[in-house]
A protein has these predicted regions:
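Carbohydrate-interacting regions of secretory-pathway proteins
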Residues: 1-135
C-alpha cells in the first residue's frame, strides 16, 4: 500500500509451489528496493510461517511453536489473517493462531502493508483474495 495503516486486519490466501521465503510486511517503509519494518513470514514447512521478522533490525522477534507448522498446506491455498492493533500482532494460518506478540517498536511503527518475495531461487508464491480493513 502507499497509505500508512495503524490498526488493521488483513485477510488473504497464499499458495507456495517452490521453496523460498516470502511474507507480508506490516507498518513498513520502502526506500528504493529496501523494505524496512516487520514481516509476517510465509515460507515452506519448517521455516516459521506466521512468525515475525524485523528487516534491517533485530531479526527474528518470535517464531511459532514448531507443532503449529501442521496448519500449513504446502502446494495448496492457505488462509492467513494478521491483526495489528497498538503494539500487538497476531497471526493465523488456516484458523490456527501462530503467534501473539506485543512489541513497543512495532507499536510505534508507521508504514504500509506490502507483499514480499525474494528475487532468485525459483520461488513461486501466489496471492489472492487480499482484504485490508482498518480497525
Amino acid at each position: 500500500t502507499t497509505a500508512q495503516y495503524d490498526d488493521f486486519e488483513v485477510d488473504l490466501e497464499f499458495k507456495q509451489e517452490a521453496n523460498g521465503n516470502s511474507g507480508v510486511f506490516i507498518r513498513s517503509t520502502v526506500d528504493g528496493t529496501k523494505v524496512s519494518g516487520w514481516q509476517v513470514e510465509v515460507a515452506p514447512p519448517g521455516n516459521d510461517t506466521g512468525g515475525i521478522y524485523e528487516s534491517y533490525g533485530r531479526g527474528w522477534l518470535i517464531k511459532p511453536d514448531p507443532e503449529k507448522d501442521k496448519a500449513l498446506k504446502f502446494g495448496e491455498w492457505n488462509k492467513m489473517k494478521i491483526v495489528v492493533q497498538g503494539d500487538r500482532v497476531i497471526s493465523y494460518v488456516n484458523g490456527v493462531e501462530m503467534v501473539n506478540y506485543a512489541d513497543e517498536k512495532i507499536g510505534a511503527g508507521k508504514g504500509g502493508v506490502l507483499l514480499q518475495i525474494h528475487d532468485g531461487g525459483g520461488i513461486k508464491v501466489y496471492w489472492r483474495n487480499i482484504v485490508l480493513k482498518k480497525l
